[in-house]
Amino acid sequence: MIGSAQSVSVMTRAQLQSFHLRRYTPERMVVAAAGNVDHDGLVALVREHFGSRLVRGRRPVAPRKGTGRVNGSPRLTLVSRDAEQTHVSLGIRTPGRGWEHRWALSVLHTALGGGLSSRLFQEVRETRGLAYSVYSALDLFADSGALSVYAACLPERFADVMRVTADVLESVARDGITEAECGIAKGSLRGGLVLGLEDSSSRMSRLGRSELNYGKHRSIEHTLRQIEQVTVEEVNAVARHLLSRRYGAAVLGPHGSKRSLPQQLRAMVG
């Protein structure tokens, strides 16, 4: 649920209904189906249930293009809470899903923190046992995106977690990943993509997202070729371009002030 307790509590049924009628309209929607589906029967059902709201020949609104906006400079946010763990999230802005190096960015994310063989998992958890959880995430939208790193650890290990995390990010920004890491990351991306297609719901979601995001169907073969074409040189160029920037950060845990947070974290935010 997005919003504060106050904003949610004053929300009315009429407001929700008005929002639904204005936003959930045929020109904003795609109906996708996968499995043993009769196409003509599906079209008939859509016409039956949407009826007069359908506009003949009108396609969904074209995906938005342009450069995303970020309000203000990267900042550090602290939520002081009496908790057993410290949670930290670091993030940097990236280009959107239409970027020409989009798949190199996905390979970078996977090699950095996208699995058990990733650099962060190996250095922070496997080798040193500093954190319960550590991983990266990549969110791509029409006009911008975000590459983030999350970790959860005991408060007394927070400084060590940030020291190792900062070292990993600086190392990848400076020296890049290895050919072997690139190959493992590409294999992980390909494997996850193909395994996901074994589920009809995933196939359906992929069809709908492709139509909404790109205005056309992108085959699995097309995506696999794009991943395969990524080189370690391209990945490392993306790493130099993005990972040398200042980060935004959010911390939740038993910490009284920003001054009490690890110096490595404050230096990364700048």
Name each model-derived stretch.
Residues 58-118:
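His/Glu-based metal-binding/catalytic segments typifying zinc-dependent metallopeptidases
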